[in-house]
Amino acid sequence: MNKKSIRDVDLKGKRVFCRVDFNVPMKEGKITDETRIRAALPTIQYLVEQGAKVILASHLGRPKGQVVEELRLTPVAARLGELLGKDVKKADEAFGPVAQEMVAAMNEGDVLVLENVRFYAGEEKNDAELAKEFAALADIFVNDAFGAAHRAHASTAGIADYLPAVSGLLMEKELDVLGKALSNPDRPFTAIIGGAKVKDKIGVIRHLLDKVDNLIIGGGLAYTFVKALGHEIGLSLCEDDKIELAKEFMQLAKEKGVNFYMPVDVVITEEFSETATTKIVGIDSIPSNWEGVDIGPKTREIYADVIKNSKLVVWNGPMGVFEMTPFSQGTKAVGQALADAEGTYSVIGGGDSAAAVEKFGMADKMSHISTGGGASLEFMEGKELPGVVCLNDK
């Protein structure tokens, strides 16, 4: 990575404004999944060890520029203190006199959590005045919130106009892993693209067709490709306005020598429920009042074989409606193939794919699970991320 990280700067005694991603799911004031807090620990611990005064900023939920009591970061600060095994202070605002006083009282190695930055309307507008207020608290800006790196907000990008700006360790790892995948991949390189809609994945498919050896398609978006081949798809998801694009992608793959894999059989159902009756049919045999909800067993075998013979696999989007047991086998099979593959580096692109490997208990078998769904998708589209562009070059 050609951006400076916290390893490249002197931190001792410095006030560090560190943007983290503590946007964790909460239920009745309790954190239900602390993955994102744990992901930030190496950076926070490094800053503490280096003798920095660690000022942490994050958003939580979508308060839309006003104070929402249940979206305060108080429970997050409390849990962080437990995980760090030290006292973590919490400010009830993200800038201004109270925050400044608390920062002024900090010693080297102290940790302070600021209030939810999205309580302020200027955050999502990338307001320069708010960015200046944040910057006034610190000597150095550290961005470790890869999950929010595709947003040009005051605390993720704007603040970098007023302070030296470097990446944290999590951000650095994300950029190294995803950057290597796109610029210098080990081959064969396979991308697995799933999820519901073609329109969400157009950019990533187009960009990856120039990079990969194999492209595997699954999930709801596959049926637009199936229809593009001239097959009937019953009640399956289809974006009729994307059929021509699907044809174009299949043609491009052929021209570029990319092996393009689509389902050969699918799991179909007449009803969307945990107890649904399902059938398995060939891709050209979906009855008019049934819909495809998962890839079939033959497809699973083919995909698993491609995965097994790949050196690098990037996976973005499930193969079916994995949240429901009858339609989860395809996604599970892809996860299992990645877990079992020897010598294959697996990159899980955040979002639903990450949720799926967690759900199936396979997370620890994956080489890298990205902490940013939208951010990793935009990165794989070849877009520049505002929260990265703003960092100082090495």
Curated annotation (Swiss-Prot):
One of its GO terms (biological process) is gluconeogenesis. The keyword Protein biosynthesis does not apply. Signal peptide: none annotated. One of its GO terms (molecular function) is ADP binding. It catalyses: (2R)-3-phosphoglycerate + ATP = (2R)-3-phospho-glyceroyl phosphate + ADP. Its EC number is 2.7.2.3. InterPro entries: Phosphoglycerate_kinase, Phosphoglycerate_kinase_CS, Phosphoglycerate_kinase_N, Phosphoglycerate_kinase_sf. The keyword Transferase applies. The modification Phosphoserine is found at S183. Keywords: ATP-binding, Cytoplasm, Glycolysis, Kinase, Nucleotide-binding, Phosphoprotein, Transferase. ATP binds at K201, G292, E323, G350, G351, D352, S353. Pathway: Carbohydrate degradation; glycolysis; pyruvate from D-glyceraldehyde 3-phosphate: step 2/5. Coiled coil: none annotated. It is found in: Cytoplasm. Belongs to the phosphoglycerate kinase family. Monomer. This is Phosphoglycerate kinase. It comes from Bacillus cereus (strain Q1).
